[in-house]
């Protein structure tokens, strides 16, 4: 299959095909069996076959592969969906529980000064007031290319359901990010700054009497999306929060209340000031239909967050490109700033603490075709059960072509009780040490490799393994 318009783009954008037929012939010869979404390039193939420019056998091959997939899927014997099977798969208690669990496990705790988890008083005791503020507080943001579930739970609704009558909840939108949230709309208009500043004043008034603030900010589906055409853009020149969201945070921070920021977004944001001044930060990404309940589960300690960042979060757009497995370079740094990211790849905190020890190897020397077992001790040094993800990285000390400074080769998320220690074992096979050499061959070169382990890509302990010498 081709991506949408990829075949016609050979003519329209990349200028490597003179006509639709030219693009179609090249795609067919490369093994592409279907032209999506309109088929406007492959529509030329019938005439090309009749006139001898494309062999009919090439069409037969593509059709045979497509029909084989349909046969394997049983679509000829039973081409219709089974409504009863569909009902068992989605929109039921089991599916909603799975969505909630997925959201719970996806959240990444970036900062916590002890503000989290929130404690609730006993029934009948004095009630705290929690201000739930922000443009992503009362809406469930599902991201791009999403289905439309019958029921979604916002952060506001999840918190209300969790606290019941044991806390007072006040809400204010704070700001609008965009004029509307329609992901499909071509035009994106930012909300009016003057109107937003009026909303900020309302949020400050609502939060003034609160004991703590939950601030849900980040993206809408419009500000973090695929830009699939010149009239449907998605890229931005900045990683800063869109619109007046930073102003909203600053105004709430001036109240002197503990602030927990919940980020709902589709890409990393540059939040240096918030990272410094917020009391707690949760990176949620897009949490799905049960996201509001899952956020409440984490805020009130029913679930101990254990997610890890799948990307590096830079301090500013000027640090880009920024990724953990960069190549060695002469990049020396910046005037007035650091090359260190705001949060490294693989980072994530917990309501407990862990100690990830130095790795040990089953052998310090192995042949080129050999494997090694890496054992990493991890101990829960805190007072409650929690998850830690042990990560193993490899670095080739000297190689014939430049390689990344570290490459993630294995990881495992483990749940440990307070005080529990576990040895987490990984087997690294020859594939873990392979590289493409200057002859474009996938090989293992003899030499020393650093085997590094830790809780994230920036805090690693290393041992040396000799391969093939």
Describe the role of every protein-language-model region.
Residues 57, 71, 77-108:
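Helix-enriched interaction subdomains in cytosolic or periplasmic regions
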Residues 1-13, 17-18, 26-28, 32-39:
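Short acidic/histidine-rich active-site segments
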Residues 22, 58, 418-420:
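An acidic, carboxylate-rich microenvironment
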Residues 33, 40, 73-76, 80, ...:
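Membrane-targeting and insertion segments and their boundary/processing signals
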